[in-house]
Amino acid sequence: MSDAEEQEYEEEQPEEEEAAEEEEEAPEEPEPAAEPEEERPKPSRPVVPPLIPPKIPEGERVDFDDIHRKRMEKDLLELQTLIDVHFEQRKKEEEELVALKERIERRRAERAEQQRFRTEKERERQAKLAEEKMRKEEEEAKKRAEDDAKKKKVLSNMGAHFGGYLVKAEQKRGKRQTGREMKLRILSERKKPLNIDHMGEEQLREKAQELSDWIHQLESEKFDLMAKLKQQKYEINVLYNRISHAQKFRKGAGKGRVGGRWK
């Protein structure tokens, strides 16, 4: 209720009170004298009390517009607070998302760098191994060529001095001499010079490990060859016994070589 309406309401209230007091103070009209012959009862009129509006205390007036305005301001403030909190939370989430993307990209770059470093190290190692292998092959080929040249030179000198005697003796010895030469050639190829004067501590360890591995490999090959030789001897003996047994019981067999002698 506005101030103008309250003022109009207060002005109308005294007028209504004065009208009610005048009605109460008005004298009652004398009733006409009733005829003695016929007296009829008059209907009584109901007395309606005047409507008096409630009085508003004069100490403090209620301003509904001010209450509504304050409530609207409070709601607006709460809404603005919620909006600020929402945008602050959204900004924080966006910053966290950006930081997460940066961490992912940084980790991806680190992994790529590590992979590139490992690939480069592996390539260098493979190149070093290939170079070492090529160097060893070149040294072995050079050494074989030098040995062959020495052998040819020795044979040519011996042929010039002794003529065809060496060729005949070589033909008589046959496979045994050839096997011996093969053995000597293999030993000369495997017997490499041990140049360790220029090596450091780490290189000496690698060289010792290489020699140890080589010895283990030779022992393994030797064991395999011994087992193979033993198996071959066993098979030869079995076949020889079968041949001997067959020749003993064969009917009409002539002379044959059994047990290293003729019968």
Swiss-Prot record:
<dbReference type="InterPro" id="IPR001978">
    <property type="entry name" value="Troponin"/>
</dbReference>
<dbReference type="GO" id="GO:0031014">
    <property type="term" value="F:troponin T binding"/>
</dbReference>
<dbReference type="GO" id="GO:0005523">
    <property type="term" value="F:tropomyosin binding"/>
</dbReference>
<dbReference type="GO" id="GO:0005861">
    <property type="term" value="C:troponin complex"/>
</dbReference>
<feature type="compositionally biased region" description="Acidic residues">
    <location>
        <begin position="1"/>
        <end position="38"/>
    </location>
</feature>
<dbReference type="InterPro" id="IPR027707">
    <property type="entry name" value="TNNT"/>
</dbReference>
<comment type="subunit">
    <text>Interacts with TPM3.</text>
</comment>
<keyword id="KW-0514">Muscle protein</keyword>
<protein>
    <recommendedName>
        <fullName>Troponin T, slow skeletal muscle</fullName>
    </recommendedName>
</protein>
<feature type="compositionally biased region" description="Basic and acidic residues">
    <location>
        <begin position="109"/>
        <end position="150"/>
    </location>
</feature>
<keyword id="KW-0597">Phosphoprotein</keyword>
<feature type="region of interest" description="Disordered">
    <location>
        <begin position="109"/>
        <end position="154"/>
    </location>
</feature>
<dbReference type="Pfam" id="PF00992">
    <property type="entry name" value="Troponin"/>
</dbReference>
<dbReference type="GO" id="GO:0031444">
    <property type="term" value="P:slow-twitch skeletal muscle fiber contraction"/>
</dbReference>
<feature type="region of interest" description="Disordered">
    <location>
        <begin position="1"/>
        <end position="64"/>
    </location>
</feature>
<dbReference type="InterPro" id="IPR038077">
    <property type="entry name" value="Troponin_sf"/>
</dbReference>
<feature type="modified residue" description="Phosphoserine; by CK2">
    <location>
        <position position="2"/>
    </location>
</feature>
<feature type="compositionally biased region" description="Pro residues">
    <location>
        <begin position="44"/>
        <end position="56"/>
    </location>
</feature>
<comment type="function">
    <text>Troponin T is the tropomyosin-binding subunit of troponin, the thin filament regulatory complex which confers calcium-sensitivity to striated muscle actomyosin ATPase activity.</text>
</comment>
<dbReference type="GO" id="GO:0006937">
    <property type="term" value="P:regulation of muscle contraction"/>
</dbReference>
<comment type="similarity">
    <text>Belongs to the troponin T family.</text>
</comment>
